[in-house]
């Protein structure tokens, strides 16, 4: 569980939404790189709505993401690093979205993207992701492009993008496992992106469910969340990977077959083209 990765100094007994906001604001103001995750325990069941309401009046709501575990009365608050994080997330999600919509037979209506949307396993646990890709057949946004046409909370994403800093790789891997396991097969592909700062580099992993055959049992094979592709990009734009391309299978994006179906592919050259402007942006800060 993510809580095991959070230092004790960042764990607090829940008092009130106001107290939570004060602690988060203190962390934001400190700028400390090792304090992007805060753990609150003793959160009463059903209090998330009250917390949301209090956060809506502050400027912090768009800077945090929540993961809850109701059985433990626990809430993990992830504090987003700011403009650099947003630039990395937005740029990659935009490039992915453009490639998806360019698949023959698809348009801008075929896939919806949502930032910070909460997905919920009723009364058990919930999570807010960075960037969710939801097929239009799930989101049912009949009123598109009205921003009020929010999808059903049951419309889980088929694919997720999660982004973090050097300290967050273990958290990102747990994020990938969370989506793949808790979505009951609805989320089929997770891309995690880690911005490393010393030295400056970008690390990308693609996760999916993979069949596992346990040699010690005669039980049917099981599916386990697994990193299926891995890429490291340095400031020169050199991509190190066992793969020649980042491939997102069509069936991981859409639920329905298509005779024109093609996978979404980023060549290593395209990954370089994505990374170099990011490095130029980030180099002014490190």
Model-derived features: positions:
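Gly/Pro/Ser/Thr-rich low-complexity, intrinsically disordered segments predominantly at protein N-termini
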Residues: 1-286
């Amino acid at each position: 569980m993510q809580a095991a990765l959070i230092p004790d100094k960042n764990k607090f007994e829940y008092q009130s939404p106001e107290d939570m906001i004060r602690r988060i604001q203190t962390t934001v103001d400190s700028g400390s790189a090792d304090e992007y995750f805060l753990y609150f325990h003793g959160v009463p069941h059903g209090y998330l709505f009250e917390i949301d309401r209090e956060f809506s009046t502050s400027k912090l709501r768009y800077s945090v993401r929540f993961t809850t575990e109701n059985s433990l009365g626990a809430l993990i608050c992830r504090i987003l690093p700011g403009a650099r994080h947003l630039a990395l997330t937005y740029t990659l999600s935009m490039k992915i979205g453009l490639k998806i919509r360019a698949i023959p037979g698809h348009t801008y209506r075929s896939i919806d993207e949502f930032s910070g949307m909460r997905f919920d396993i009723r009364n058990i646990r919930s999570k807010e992701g960075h960037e969710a890709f939801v097929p239009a057949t799930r989101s049912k946004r009949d009123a598109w492009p009205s921003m009020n046409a929010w999808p059903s909370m049951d419309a889980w994403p088929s694919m997720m993008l999660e982004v973090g800093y050097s300290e967050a790789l273990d958290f990102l891997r747990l994020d990938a496992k969370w989506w793949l396991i808790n979505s009951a097969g609805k989320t089929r592909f997770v891309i995690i992106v880690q911005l490393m700062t010393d030295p400056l580099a970008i690390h990308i992993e693609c996760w999916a469910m993979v069949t596992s055959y346990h040699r010690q049992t005669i039980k049917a094979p099981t599916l386990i969340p697994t990193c299926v592709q891995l890429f490291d990009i340095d400031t020169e734009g050199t991509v190190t990977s066992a793969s020649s391309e980042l491939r997102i299978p069509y069936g991981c994006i859409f639920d329905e077959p298509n005779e024109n179906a093609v996978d979404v592919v980023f060549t290593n050259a395209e990954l370089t083209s994505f990374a170099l402007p990011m490095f130029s942006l980030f180099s002014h800060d490190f």
